[in-house]
From Swiss-Prot:
Name of the protein: Ornithine decarboxylase antizyme
Biological process, per Gene Ontology: positive regulation of protein catabolic process; viral translational frameshifting
GO molecular function, one term: ornithine decarboxylase inhibitor activity
Similarity comment: Belongs to the ODC antizyme family.
Originating species: Drosophila melanogaster
């Protein structure tokens, strides 16, 4: 499980923080928009990604796909998509979270992703590393929808922005979290952010009307998250006027 400690991280987003609109598949379409800090301007990457991950500590294994156990199969990154444009028509990333979140009774994530025209199937460690290389090569904030499987048939979509300027991952907590496996799913997200994206911290945003809010906050604090002031440098400056969300910071030890 990821470790935590206090790090000093730089401010990034302004009141022009972005929102993503999703179509039925959960993949973003649309326009490019500029976001900024008080001292500099940062442009969102024109590309966005959607990746599929499973619950478990082993993200990629050298065991052949068709010979995996259920646990190994769930841990495999089996597909991703990349879009050449993103929709940031207004509002904030967090407002789009509940619309992006979903539970599905689809087939396995490989076949589900392959139903989209711009999907790439991943069946080797080299493929997985190439996806990470493409994501990490961006020097501008890039939007990533992380499809986290609770089982092979149920998943939630997590709307995130990876900001290389301050090396933070901004995550909007989905409104509808499955009761079964939600803790392990969340731990999987933390492990992916720390071990694969190698971020310095995670800023989690929770709507104040989040179902089962008290239990989730208790779980966050237990895992090492700390309440984050809306005026803190790690929070997007748009948070100063945001009365609808709670902010939490998870700092990752180097």
């Amino acid at each position: 499980m990821p470790s935590n400690m206090n790090n000093k991280l730089d401010p990034v987003f302004s009141s022009g923080f972005v929102r993503r609109e999703f179509n039925d598949s959960g993949i973003a379409d649309g326009k490019l928009r500029t976001i900024s800090t008080s001292s500099c301007a940062t442009t969102m990457s024109s590309e966005s990604y959607r990746i599929s991950l499973g619950v478990g500590p082993l993200w990629w294994s050298d065991v052949p796909v068709h010979h995996r156990t259920d646990h190994d199969r769930a841990s495999l990154l089996t597909g991703y998509s990349r879009k050449s444009s993103v929709d940031s028509a207004g509002g904030s990333l967090y407002e789009a979270s509940s619309r992006a979140s979903s539970l599905s009774s689809s087939q396995s994530d490989c076949s589900d992703l392959e139903s989209q025209p711009d999907i790439h199937s991943l069946c080797s460690d080299d493929d997985c590393q190439e996806v990470l290389r493409q994501i990490l090569q961006h020097d501008q904030p890039v939007q990533i929808t992380i499809k986290l499987h609770v089982t092979e048939d149920q998943y939630t979509n997590w709307n995130t922005i990876l900001n290389p300027v301050n090396n933070l991952l901004y995550v909007a907590l989905p409104k509808d979290l499955p009761p079964a496996g939600s803790k392990q799913t969340f731990i999987s997200l933390l492990e992916f952010a720390e071990e694969k994206l190698e971020v310095d911290g995670i800023v989690m945003v929770m709507p104040k009307d989040q179902p089962d809010r008290a239990r989730l906050i208790e779980a966050f604090l237990f895992m090492g998250f700390e309440p984050l002031s809306r005026k803190a440098p790690q929070a997007p400056p748009a948070a100063i006027n945001d009365n609808e969300n709670y902010y939490f910071l998870y700092s990752i030890e180097e």
